[in-house]
Amino acid sequence: MNSYFSLSASQQRTLITQTAVRLGLPEQAVEKDLWVSIILQLVFTLPFSDKLVFKGGTSLSKSFGLIERFSEDIDLVVDRSFFDLHGDLTKKQIKGLRKKSSLFVRDDLTNLLKAAMVSYGLDEYCSVVPEDDGEGDHTYPEPRKIDVYYRTLFPLNEYLQPRVMLEIGARSLFEPTVNTSIQSLVTTQFPQIDTGLVSAHSIATAAPQKTFLEKTFLLHELFTSQRGISAERKSRHLYDLEKMMDVPFAIQAIEDDHLWGTIAHHREVFTSLSGVDYTPDIRDRIVLCPPEEVRSVWERDYSDMQQSMIYGASLPFDALLERISLLEKKFHDR
């Protein structure tokens, strides 16, 4: 097996271009996926990796192959037991957790990631930049982002910047998880090319049924508290749900009272939004489709995603909403 990093820049460019042609994706998307894969593997070699869980939409594609949109960022959760906090927390404790987590990401995680980059010779390709502190109540952003800027081989694409964003927080629900492994799109198309720098590591990953229910909860919160005014990069949740809704784990998750109750309780305690009533069972009245007055904005965002991020089949927007309406009804009628 040949290492991607033993190839010349010209050979790397050709390899990414051939992968992009096979998958019907922009070259910049394939290149970004490669760096997402490398950085994710690298993070799970760090000393505290046993306290991390990989979650979100990128896990659905990279770990489970449930969706066919390329990976853009890396969402991670730190087990709050790492900060000696357990169970339900008071508002004061949650505020303290946010500060501890934010400082940990800004200082410890960033410095260890930089050191790992140097150790594996990636510092000549990448730079690691943590999110700046804010002001006032937002001095310590949580989750806090880390941007990894990589040296691109291709012309700049406005929608696909040469940057991998890690978003790391400690308030998300940590379990249930499963162990997975990941590989880049380049390696899936050219198995003889190894794009990893580290040995295959088991990556603790949020179980897909949890991600499925959390995405439904997120859309309900968006459409009931904010009326879905901001659609930028959010239509992916509609796409993800449509892709998962007929898979057995999703069908079972809709009726899983225990898992739903755990997620609902956790969101109410740790990440509640004003304007959302968490008390009765939200499944009875869940809203998953954008309101009519903002539907065109969501359609534009979905069109952008189809062109730049999806490498498999995807429905027209109207057909997508028909399917999501059906999913909404399944929750109501369970």
Report the location of each language-model feature:
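Structured mid-to-C-terminal alpha-helical surface segments
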Residues: 1-52, 64-68, 74, 80-334
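Glycine-rich beta-strand-to-loop/alpha-helix junction loops that act as flexible
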Residues: 54-58
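Betabetaalpha-Me/HNH-type nuclease active-site subdomain
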Residues: 61
